């Protein structure tokens, strides 16, 4: 089996104390990530998103941006990543997104997922989560709300590796 790092330049951390590893209202999970050219290229190949705003600096400048953009959905993919890292087997039910500002190659983004409400249905939990991404220097770039079905409220240490054969 081959072990691969999903994102070599990402860091997952939690604001929960070591004594309490149960998700509760107000719990915050975060991941820092810096996107590189290779990330945008890989995303484009996978999704067939060939928008020139992501690859052609002149096109991006003509559209009013300072450089090529990181696709918004690539940035937003940090949210399910955080949830899956802490709750293996979680099912992402829904997500709303509001794209506020552009993200450029090399920007360090901090994604945050905060539990807003939690309800138990049989042996599963439905968690409503506030989601946001900010640039390291402060501006909000994406916000929204997610709903996930969790198999447990126990927050596992983040699993950042995948196995492929």
From Swiss-Prot:
> Where primarily located?
mitochondrion
Is RNA-binding tagged as a keyword? Answer: no
Keywords, A to Z, come to: Fatty acid metabolism, Lipid metabolism, Lyase, Mitochondrion, Transit peptide
Catalyses: a (3R)-hydroxyacyl-[ACP] = a (2E)-enoyl-[ACP] + H2O
Known partners and oligomeric status: Homodimer.
SUPFAM superfamilies tied to this protein: Thioesterase/thiol ester dehydrase-isomerase (SSF54637)
Question: Where are its TM segments located?
Answer: none
State the name under which the record lists this protein: 3-hydroxyacyl-[acyl-carrier-protein] dehydratase FERN, mitochondrial
What InterPro entries does the entry give? HotDog_dom_sf, MaoC-like_dom, UPF0336/Enoyl-CoA_hydratase
- Which residue intervals define the domain MaoC-like in the entry? 36-124
A Gene Ontology biological process term? fatty acid biosynthetic process
Q: In which pathway does it act?
A: Lipid metabolism; fatty acid biosynthesis
Class of enzymatic activity (EC top level) = lyase
Biological function: 3-hydroxyl-[acyl-carrier-protein] (3-hydroxyl-ACP) dehydratase required for mitochondrial fatty acid synthesis (mtFAS). Essential for photorespiration, tomato morphogenesis and plant development, probably by influencing mitochondrial membrane lipid composition and other lipid metabolic pathways, and by contributing to energy supply and reactive oxygen species (ROS) homeostasis.
GO MF terms held by the record: (3R)-hydroxyacyl-[acyl-carrier-protein] dehydratase activity; fatty acid synthase activity
Query: Which Gene3D superfamilies does the protein's record reference?
Result: Hotdog Thioesterase (3.10.129.10)
* E.C. code: 4.2.1.59
Does the record's keyword annotation contain Signal?
no
Question: Transit peptide: which residues?
Answer: 1-35
A cellular-component GO term for this protein: mitochondrion
Q: Where in the cell is it found?
A: Mitochondrion
